[in-house]
UniProtKB/Swiss-Prot annotation:
Organism: Parasynechococcus marenigrum (strain WH8102)
Top-rank EC class of the record's enzyme: oxidoreductase
Entry note: cofactor: Binds 1 [4Fe-4S] cluster per subunit.
Keyword match 4Fe-4S: yes
Primary gene name: ispH
Protein function: Catalyzes the conversion of 1-hydroxy-2-methyl-2-(E)-butenyl 4-diphosphate (HMBPP) into a mixture of isopentenyl diphosphate (IPP) and dimethylallyl diphosphate (DMAPP). Acts in the terminal step of the DOXP/MEP pathway for isoprenoid precursor biosynthesis.
Cofactor(s) listed in the protein's UniProt record: [4Fe-4S] cluster
Family of this protein: Belongs to the IspH family.
Annotated S-S bridges: none
This protein's name: 4-hydroxy-3-methylbut-2-enyl diphosphate reductase
UniProt-annotated binding residues for [4Fe-4S] cluster: 66, 157, 288
Length: 399
């Protein structure tokens, strides 16, 4: 399928909108009440620091809603305002934040049901309005909705669209896209649908397996068993790993994406030599600015003397998980929560999700005496949620 031609055709359709409806002022008050925070503004103005009795809060200098998320949420609110009576769907969570998605449900936005990992579009009919979330949607989903006569409101983050353009260029030049991402993440599913030949690698460990195979150090059967669910149909590692381009899920850890890119550049240089390197490896630049800013701010924050860290964001949020990884890499006692409700100020307890584990309830969360708490949040977390966590910490520090 010529995905580029399909996108161009879709973008010219009268039933497609990716620019909003000019109703920003009409939804501004609702957005402010639901997501913004006066306290957070005050803390920003005070050098990202708050002192309250024995408690000191240090905020990361970049956190919370990124521009792409703000845009997607605002467009969703505008869509309901523009289509007050129409049946309104969304193909997935608008962003990885439970409170934001709950607000959409309260606005009678229906989420496409999922049965055994497969989306069921049978309830969507001609004339329905369907929102594509910030992560985007697969080209097959877009095609289905277009053919069904739906009105499509596309809130896909432009940084994600940039990655799609990158893998389409790879496809045009018969280059295999190595996608650094989580194979079942909505964004990676969408990106791979625009690619031609592709292989998804989760981390440096998997990237090294691919690099070793390119240099003749791997077993084909073992390789295919490892990556059978992470590659394009008909993928042949002996044929399809000779010309590579790297792309990424925009919320992955920036440093690891760059390291993976350097690994494959060295690998192709070793195999083909400097004279032929440009024929076998394509450099990339698909790292999201907002993701990079939040990770850089987190690295700066964990250099400060912190007693503990609270990371706020959806448990299925990739960018939030990577912020948690940064704290843990510095040996900081860190807690990942998805909503302020996880913190019980009366009992000094917190229900949190340790990395790669199930939820855990921890007592004696805030230690006695003077305590400095670092706080950051993922790109899908509104300031209001961060404010509520800080208010609970202030209350807890007084007890």
């Amino acid at each position: 399928m010529d995905t580029h031609a399909f996108k161009r055709s879709l973008h010219h359709s009268e039933r497609y909108n990716r620019r909003g409806f000019g109703r920003a002022e009409e939804v501004a008050e609702s957005l402010e009440q639901a997501y913004q925070s006066g306290l957070i503004g005050t803390i920003r103005d005070n050098g990202y620091k708050l002192s309250h009795g024995r408690l000191t809060v240090r905020l990361a200098e970049a956190f919370g809603f990124c521009w792409g998320v703000e845009r997607a949420v605002a467009m969703a609110y505008e869509t309901r305002k523009h289509y007050p009576a129409e049946r309104l769907w969304i193909t997935n969570e608008i962003i990885h934040n439970p409170s934001v998605n709950d607000h959409l449900r309260e606005m009678d936005v229906q989420f496409i049901p999922v049965e055994q990992g497969v989306k069921d579009f049978s309830g969507v009919t001609s004339g329905d309005v369907v929102i594509l979330p910030a992560f985007g949607a697969t080209v097959q989903e877009m095609q289905l909705l277009n053919e069904r006569g739906c009105h499509i409101v596309d809130t896909t983050c432009p940084w994600v669209s940039k990655v799609w353009t990158t893998v389409e260029k790879h496809k045009k030049h018969t280059i295999t896209s190595i996608i650094h991402g989580k194979v079942k993440h909505e964004e990676t599913l969408a990106t791979s649908s625009f690619a031609g030949t592709y292989l998804v690698v989760l981390d440096m460990e998997e990237a090294q397996i691919v690099a070793d195979y390119i240099l003749g150090k791997g077993d084909r059967d073992a390789f295919m068993q490892r990556f059978s669910a992470a590659c394009s149909p008909g993928f042949d590692p002996d044929r399809d790993l000779s010309r590579l381009g790297v792309a990424n899920q925009t919320t992955m850890l920036k440093s690891e994406t760059e390291e993976i890119g350097r690994l494959f550049e060295r690998t192709m240089l070793s195999k083909y030599g400097p004279a032929e390197l440009n024929d076998h490896f394509v450099a990339f630049n698909t790292i999201c600015d907002a993701t990079q800013e939040r990770q850089d701010a987190m690295f700066s924050l964990v250099d400060e003397p912190l007693d503990l860290m609270v990371v706020i964001g959806g448990f299925n949020s990739s960018n939030t998980t990577h912020l948690q990884e940064i704290a843990l890499s510095r040996g900081i006692r860190s807690f990942h929560i998805d909503t302020p409700d996880r913190l019980d100020a009366q009992a000094n307890a917190i229900e949190h999700k340790p990395l790669n584990e199930n939820l855990r309830l921890e007592s004696n969360f805030l230690p006695a005496g003077p305590v400095t708490v670092g706080i950051t949040s993922g790109a899908s977390t509104p300031d209001r949620a961060v404010e509520e966590v800080i208010e609970k910490l202030m209350l807890l520090s007084e007890s």
